[in-house]
Swiss-Prot record:
SMART domains: RNAse_Pc (SM00092). Its EC number is 4.6.1.18. The gene is rnase1. The lineage of its organism: Eukaryota, Metazoa, Chordata, Craniata, Vertebrata. It catalyses: an [RNA] containing cytidine + H2O = an [RNA]-3'-cytidine-3'-phosphate + a 5'-hydroxy-ribonucleotide-3'-[RNA]; an [RNA] containing uridine + H2O = an [RNA]-3'-uridine-3'-phosphate + a 5'-hydroxy-ribonucleotide-3'-[RNA]. This is Ribonuclease pancreatic.
Length: 75
């Protein structure tokens, strides 16, 4: 339940409930410097076949917020 509350709060506070709902929104719980540092690390193929993804050398804390069957725009 706490992840659900976090997702609802973050989606509203960042105005991510405008126009349409994306199936997944990912929030990274790391410093901006740590996130930016990933871009200078190993370039790898993305899951969708594109080549503009990067592999972090360290584990990062994230929260994936997924649209549920009961999700309703704009909430």
């Amino acid at each position: 339940a706490s992840t659900s509350n976090y997702c609802n709060q973050m989606m509203k506070s960042r105005n991510l409930t405008q126009n349409r709902c994306k199936p997944v929104n990912t929030f990274v719980h790391e410093s901006l410097a740590d996130v930016q540092a990933v871009c200078s690390q190993k370039n790898v193929a993305c899951k969708n076949g594109q080549t503009n993804c990067y592999q972090s050398y360290s584990t990062m804390s994230i929260t994936d917020c997924r649209e549920t069957g009961s999700s309703k725009y704009p909430n």
